Amino acid sequence: MNEKLYVSVLGATGMVGQNYLRLLENHPWFQIVDVAASPRSAGKKYADAVDGNWLMQDEIPNSVKDLVVRDVRDFDAISENVKCVFSAMDLPDKTDTRNLEFEYAKAGYPIISNSSANRWIDDVPMIIPEINPDHVDIIPFQQSNRNLPASGFVAVKPNCSIQSYLVTLFALEEAGFPVDKVQVTTLQALSGGGQATITSLEMRENVIPFIGGEEEKTENEPLKILGHVTNAGIQNTDRIDISATCTRVPVID
């Protein structure tokens, strides 16, 4: 790419949003020109909004320090240069996250979301590029089904644990070794649970043997990723049975 794509990050002051900013700093394809968060942070310079609450080991990227945080619901204030939006929103009600992401899509923005809010919507692709890049073929159906403009859509990434093992399972199947049953045990970092998990006293020198909702995601999301696109949405596969135990361990990343 000769020119970088100007992007926005929603939920930029939270832990996942901070990680987005860290990863996109000096990226060859993307340049962050817009950061959005809750009304509490809106109107502040980004460095001031996360003062005392920056959770990354690296320093705040220089390219975003002076960006003024936009209220995530203030569409009128979005920089006109923004062509793509990364969503790290984690609103208390997932329905609000789901609806707000589609509001951005209706405004003409491609939404690439880290949130789980839209993962189980039939017309939303959940992509691991090495496995199911063809699932982007559902996007025209999503746009037609929801009356979205040609430039607007929602696509999501899977839960953090999925890409650690599903690429291997897919490679086995592609090589002619079909997998029928899988037993998965994950040891997931504190960072996956957000700031509240990192600061929790119960996590010091401890392993939590259960993470609410994680086992369901680990067992079910692969079925969508390994599924196929139909005229009415993405059809999950039924050829594999996954059983998961998910634990939280006291490491940051």
Language-model segment annotations:
Residues 192-253:
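Charged docking surfaces used in two-component/phosphorelay signaling
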Residues 1-211, 234:
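N-terminal Rossmann-like NAD(P) cofactor-binding subdomain of oxidoreductases
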